[in-house]
Amino acid sequence: MPKHLPADSVGIVEQHSLHFDEPLPLDCGRSLPAYDLVYETYGELNAERSNAILICHALSGSHHAAGYHSEEDRKPGWWEACVGPGKPIDTDRFYVVCCNNLGGCHGSTGPSSINPETHRPYGPDFPLVTVRDWVHSQARLADALGIERWAAVVGGSLGGMQAIQWAIDYPDRLGHVVAIAVAPRLSAQNIGFNEVARQAILTDPEFHGGRYYEHHTVPRRGLALARMLGHITYLSDDAMRDKFGRDLRADGGRYKFNFDVEFEVESYLRYQGRSFVDRFDANTYLLMTKVLDYFDPAAEYDHDLSAALAHVQARFLLISFSSDWRFPPERSREIVRALEDNQKPISYLEVETSQGHDAFLKPIPVYTEAFRAYMQGIAREVGA
């Protein structure tokens, strides 16, 4: 952490935890009899309780969206670019909540948690959950925090899918949806990427059928490979060319003619894989990819997205990025058209950038200024 915190940082933050004893029915037909949700908050809830914002995290995210946990922290929260005083999600005006979703590995109940029935980690016995399950658990968190209505539910990628599901399932409990770099469902190609990632983990000899905790080991190679594959899909060809090109690491630009790391891009991907293993759980990664695969709100409406969104009451802001080939702009435009079919209020921005899918995490001026302007409008609307 820098010696002096930036003026636009929320600073040192604390995580909180709530325990829920009421069983949570799940889409898979099972239920969680009890569970914990870990979350962080930034800013102050106003007297009218009208300025609350829910941030939903993506696959590898957590409740730690902004700020630092201690002075020893090397990096701030995952959305530091957009959350803080004067930033798009302005913590001088909004009360911001971000929770680690069920099935996660950062404190909320998930595969690495102890199963009260067996007194061992859940591992593969943890139920597969859906975006809708997450939204229902988040609604219970809102109840516990005394928040009847969110000023907005905001998220990028998988987080944006949760925001859309909120508008469908709880239309009267949010004023706005901000969904960034999102899609109404995964394509066959995206499901294919997820399956390759899962196979990398499932076939690692150290996976042990998901019970690697009991073997005091971790499927490091499989999880690292899954992350390397995922990371390629989060970048664009242009971004990788600009960052790495065909640069070699050493040896005066000469090939080694072996399978050691030679290209800078190889070194980068291996580093991303190794560092990810130290902060993420393989069973959670498997679960998160399935959550993505299963998201398809139109499926219950004869695959008619317009019908799925017919009863939403929230206003929408959708933002896509030109070089995002994982969830390209056309996928956001599908949602725009479905909302327009229902004469719902919608704002849409397509940002020209070479940053790929991960652009939603970056401080790209056109993106952050549009995001900030929209959120300022919400602040005025709720008197924040």
Swiss-Prot record:
Belongs to the AB hydrolase superfamily. MetX family. Residues 51-361 form the AB hydrolase-1 domain. One of its GO terms (cellular component) is cytoplasm. Homodimer. This is Homoserine O-succinyltransferase. InterPro entries: AB_hydrolase_1 (IPR000073), AB_hydrolase_fold (IPR029058), HAT_MetX-like (IPR008220). It is found in: Cytoplasm. Its main location: cytoplasm. Pathway: Amino-acid biosynthesis; L-methionine biosynthesis via de novo pathway; O-succinyl-L-homoserine from L-homoserine: step 1/1. One of its GO terms (biological process) is homoserine metabolic process. Its EC number is 2.3.1.46. SUPFAM superfamilies: alpha/beta-Hydrolases. HAMAP family: MetX_acyltransf. It catalyses: L-homoserine + succinyl-CoA = O-succinyl-L-homoserine + CoA. It is an enzyme of class 2 (transferase). Keywords: Acyltransferase, Amino-acid biosynthesis, Cytoplasm, Methionine biosynthesis, Transferase. GO terms for molecular function: homoserine O-acetyltransferase activity; homoserine O-succinyltransferase activity. The active site is at S157 (nucleophile), D324, H357. Transfers a succinyl group from succinyl-CoA to L-homoserine, forming succinyl-L-homoserine. The keyword S-adenosyl-L-methionine does not apply. Substrate binds at R227, D358. It comes from Alkalilimnicola ehrlichii (strain ATCC BAA-1101 / DSM 17681 / MLHE-1).
